[in-house]
Amino acid sequence: MTAVRTAALLVCLSCPAAAEDWVALTGPEITQALTSRVLGYPDGTLQDFKAGGQTIAGAATGRWTVQGDLYCSVWPPSDRWVCYDVARSARGLDIRFTGDDGSVTVGRYVDLQ
């Protein structure tokens, strides 16, 4: 029984904590977290968030803004703005974008790796 408890403890320690790992950001915090920063994504794409509202990801150029407590972006040829909840990892290295549909994208600051 002790071996089972030890194994369960080791499994739990290797799992990230659910709510404690991420801190939801407010509008001003989103602006501060993204302005003039570059995030890298698992597929190798880099996204640059320019101070003037331009964002560049790979060969694509779009626009970004903060509306309330949401990050919003538009990527031509679409003219539809899509907004996301934003959270920062507890260690401050990663930014998580969560869409209305529950989709999640996580990027890491390239200057903090």
Q: Regions from the language model: what does each represent?
A:
Residues 11-14:
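Repetitive helical segments and hydrophobic/amphipathic motifs
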